[in-house]
Regions:
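A short, conserved alpha-helix within the catalytic core of class I
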Residues: 150-165
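Conserved beta-strand signature within the Rossmann-like core of class I S-adenosyl-L-methionine
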Residues: 170-179
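A short SAM/SAH-binding and catalytic strip from SAM-dependent methyltransferases
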Residues: 139-154
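Class I S-adenosyl-L-methionine-dependent methyltransferase module
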Residues: 47-121
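A short acidic, Gly/Pro-enriched loop at the edge of an enzyme's catalytic core
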Residues: 129-141
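Class I SAM-dependent methyltransferase Rossmann-like catalytic core
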Residues: 1-28, 63-65
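Conserved class I S-adenosyl-L-methionine
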Residues: 26-37, 45, 52-56
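Class I S-adenosyl-L-methionine
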Residues: 181-227
Length: 243
């Protein structure tokens, strides 16, 4: 993948807290943000004393190149947002313009932190389904706006392999959202949960206090029954349906 094929879009710490139900006691946990892109989550979580590593293919490039790509693509992103405001749940006086401003602010915060954070090892180039980390490196892995959302581009097999890989490096995984780009519940969701159950993992769908895209207000929480227990894909049981 080349940089000119990527449309960078970043979210802020408040978004991550709400999407993944992150609390103050999570500051003590070792976090992995998978597919974070130009989000300010790492910068602000780290500034507050938290421990987090962000992983994304875009981190192959320096700040100047990423910043130039954001400058080139963000006007079109905003234009599309204004062209289809019905996709967004805008309440309490919020507007598409205000939402776009939040995204822009988050990306500028990322760019200011990225050089220092990169040298500190907080930003690592890479992506699913093969992670460059040792087993049990993290306590919690979060992944936003990648799995399930792009079900037309990422196969069921990719989803299953990616989540099992996240479970290899972290005892718990949280994924948001569970809808596709059209706003419907992803067709991959229950087959993925079945595969995870067969592999020995537990999963639960959690309603969160966050809904920017209509219908996108659920997170999938996946965890190993015991942090030291390996997850091995098998082929027998039906998944538990937990809500």
């Amino acid at each position: 993948m080349q940089l000119d094929e990527i449309v960078p879009l970043g979210r802020g710490l408040a978004d991550y807290r709400a999407m993944f139900v992150l609390r103050a006691d999570d500051m003590a946990r070792r976090l992995l943000g998978c597919g974070d892109g130009p989000a300010s989550f790492n910068a602000d979580w780290s500034a507050g004393g938290g421990r987090v590593v962000s992983l994304d293919p875009i981190y192959r490039w320096p700040a100047a190149a990423i910043g130039a790509r954001i400058e080139a693509t963000f006007p079109e992103v905003v234009e599309k947002m204004h062209a289809d405001p019905g996709r967004f749940r805008l309440t309490g006086g919020r507007t598409v313009g205000a939402l776009a401003a939040r995204r822009w602010s988050a990306m500028q915060r990322f760019l200011s932190d990225y050089p220092t954070g990169g040298r500190a090892g907080r930003y690592v180039a890479g992506g699913l389904p093969d992670l460059p980390f040792a087993n049990d490196r993290f306590d919690l892995a979060v992944c936003a706006h990648l799995l399930f959302l792009y079900e037309d581009h990422l196969s069921l097999a990719f989803h299953t392999r990616a989540i099992l890989e996240l479970l290899r490096v972290a005892a718990e995984v949280r994924l948001f959202p569970l809808v596709n780009l059209a706003g419907g519940r992803s067709a991959h969701l229950e087959p993925v949960r079945s595969a995870l159950h067969r592999a020995g993992a537990h999963s639960a769908i959690v309603t969160v206090d966050y809904e920017v895209q209509f219908g996108a207000r659920h997170m999938l929480r996946v965890w190993r029954p015991c942090p030291s227990e390996p997850i091995v894909e098998t082929s027998n049981h039906e998944a538990e349906k937990k809500t």
